[in-house]
Amino acid sequence: MRALPAEVATAIGQKTKVGVVARPVINMSQNDAKAYTEWLSAKTGNVYRLPSEAEWEYAARAGTVTPFSSGKTINSSWSNYGNKKGKTDWVGHYSPNGFGLHDVHGNVWEWVEDCWNNGYAGAPSDTNVWQASDCRLRVLRGGSWVNDLQSVRSAYRQAFEPGNRNFNVGFRIARTLP
């Protein structure tokens, strides 16, 4: 089994302790996130990965067509955004969306697998990863605790270099079912 890279293990170890509510893991590049999913897949025998952009948005919307899974707007009692707290909040602190997912709006940006594309023209019509266009940039979704309301909408997306780390960037994993 491939070892988890030391910098990824250190970052995750600092944020997760058994029986302790944790803050999201931050300062993670897409490369770090993918290394973690490869390690977890090898360790468990299940297939873990970053979600595609389409999967992420579908999960964030939770069956809605509104800007937020909770409706047309959101406030700080439902999400950590707008630098109101000055830091990340505990994982699961806010109410889940209709699919049971917590913290999809704000708290930390989340990596997805897709390459950056300026728009949706030519996007896959299913949930497949979009590998066309500019793969020197990848996609972040969800916004973070420092972003404004516009940037934490379900549809908002941001380009970022896959090797870069930032204080407000983390990841959420998906599991491929057998």
Range-by-range predicted roles:
Residues 10-158, 162-167:
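Functional-site microenvironments in short loops/helix caps that host divalent-cation chemistry
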Residues 167-178:
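Short, structured beta-strand segments at or near domain termini in extracellular proteins/domains
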Residues 1-2, 37:
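A short amphipathic alpha-helical interaction element
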